[in-house]
Design a protein with these regions (language model features):
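ATP-dependent carboxylate-amine ligase
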Residues: 1-154
Length: 154
């Protein structure tokens, strides 16, 4: 349900939509297949990664199931953009970096990370919001400086 809610937002993005997707290894096989189907319906480009901790699954198995779901959706013949690009890059850091490298100016990159702090670090290392300054006047015009800071981080 949470992925479908995310999809409602992402589908309306006017630029390129790139997803770095994966999930914890202790999920059911059909959950991974469903994630792949949903991703194929949402994104223009999909990079399938796996968590470092596969939670008992053989390395590559969860990604294989997600890949299967992407292919199942694309082979259904529904009304979709046949130019969906998808691939597996199992290492989360490599997958995130590849998505960020490929993202044009107006794109949206959605990352479903195992390690949120690692993902944020990779994004921050690229200085994506160079010109944004939190000046005193910006903070004073806001109801709350904490609200403003939170909205910029999220």
């Amino acid at each position: 349900a949470s992925y479908e809610a995310l999809g409602g937002f992402v589908r309306n993005w006017p630029g390129k939509r790139i997803g770095v997707i994966g999930g914890p290894g202790d999920r059911r096989d059909e959950d991974f297949v469903s994630l792949g189907e949903l991703a194929a319906d949402i994104f223009d480009e999909i990079i399938i990664k796996e968590d470092d901790d596969t939670r008992g699954r053989p390395r590559g198995n969860a990604a294989e199931l997600i890949y299967q779901g992407v292919e199942q959706f694309l082979n259904q013949g529904k009304d979709f953009d046949s130019r969906v690009i998808y691939e597996s890059i199992l290492d989360e850091t490599s997958a995130i970096n590849m998505a960020l490298d490929r993202a044009p100016f107006d794109s949206l990159v959605v990352i479903l990370p195992e390690s949120v702090s690692r993902a944020i670090g990779l994004i921050e290392a690229r200085n994506p919001v160079k010109d944004l300054e939190l000046s005193e006047s910006n903070l004073k015009s806001s109801k709350s400086s904490e609200e403003l800071k939170t909205s910029i981080v999220h």
